[in-house]
């Protein structure tokens, strides 16, 4: 038997550390619960006091509804901008058990919007960070964590343990997976999404009779149209509002406020700019020809678990045609051009907002989208004394749009064009750490 590799040992150490942390959390939970003796079959005095202000709201449903919350088990997929506020309010409201699944770790760039995490938790799994916060917020809630990605292999085993699922992800492939698994298991989904200053939420497969995600979107969006928070940016409170609303819908479902008779499929849309606006649209009912919840379903648990349904293939990948390596230079190579004061032109194709955050000296800002991408000529943006034989270097944030721009310049007849590999992000790593990453 061969000796385990360094990578295998490190993975095993990480797993043992996670198991140790979970045991400590469980032991701490036991000691916390011992402090609260029940005064009846339902709650301790602390719980009556903790939840009293929501139990006296007529629409909530008094003690009966609070008991339903305590007996419920909710899975939250994603502990980011949507999942963070949803987790805070669901745990505060008294959900009995909350599962959190997220493979990512906390990064400093998350903290302006993912409010369940803090600076001390940077580098920690998001689900562990969220668990730590919830344990301090409400010791009556049991928290189960899954520091892994939801996939074809584990989805049914995890989702089957819960009554309801919150989809707080930002990946179309995972969104379709959650939908299909929940429909096949008869679970209701509270689904949210958000980007920049806009967000949406809806309730899917309500009581296993309402429309599902595939009823609304039989086909996924074009991969080229999908923008991440990293690329498009995000206003924290705008997305947080959607996460809070998801918690409200979850409470209404669990407490029985919604019934098959009064529930109407809807899509709620929130926009923060230019004026705050919240609109609710009535959506169509379950579709008879839906691939998973229709009269003749084409998707089964077996097909998902054996990989017949490949969600990444179904959703596709963004098409990207990289430029030939001979037209690319490293940040250090470009730095040599600058240090030697060699005549050249530097074009920065990032959006104006990003250019204003930081840029290299003497850079000319020509946004790739929509300006550069649609342009038939580029001369109007270049210095008056420039010629087509000048050396032109193109930079962006990560080195993707700059390749597209460089290729277009070559097609326009500029022979001496070079793309700066890795963009400003790589420049910060290799040349000047004072250039901020954002």
Curated annotation (Swiss-Prot):
Binds 1 zinc ion per subunit. It is an enzyme of class 2 (transferase). InterPro entries: MOCS3/Uba4, Rhodanese-like_dom, Rhodanese-like_dom_sf, ThiF/MoeB/HesA, ThiF_NAD_FAD-bd, Ubiquitin-activating_enz. Keywords: ATP-binding, Cytoplasm, Metal-binding, Multifunctional enzyme, Nucleotide-binding, Nucleotidyltransferase, Transferase, tRNA processing, Ubl conjugation pathway, Zinc. ATP binds at residues 81, 102, 109-113, 126, 170-171. Pfam families: Rhodanese, ThiF. This is Adenylyltransferase and sulfurtransferase UBA4. It comes from Candida albicans (strain SC5314 / ATCC MYA-2876).
